[in-house]
């Protein structure tokens, strides 16, 4: 599985995709407020929610889930 997270100026978006051969299927997606005072808070809130877990870090460390991330914010962060 792959999770894509985009940190925007207002919203942090996360989407979970399943790999089926060369096809990707959207499994889940969430939208959470961007926490401009500490970006990691909103980032991990989105990540945990899209994976439906309390702490996504073990899944990332084990390689069970791949992570792709970006920022579409225009200034301000």
Language-model-derived ranges and their functions:
Residues 1-77:
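N-terminally biased helix-coil "hinge/interface" segments that flank
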């Amino acid at each position: 599985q792959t999770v894509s997270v985009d940190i925007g100026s207002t919203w942090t978006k996360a989407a979970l995709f399943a790999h089926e051969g060369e096809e990707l299927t959207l499994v889940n997606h969430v939208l959470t407020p961007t926490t401009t005072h500490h970006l990691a808070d909103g980032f991990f809130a989105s990540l945990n929610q899209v994976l439906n877990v309390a702490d996504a870090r073990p899944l990332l460390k084990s390689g069970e889930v791949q992570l792709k991330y970006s920022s579409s914010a225009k200034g301000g962060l």
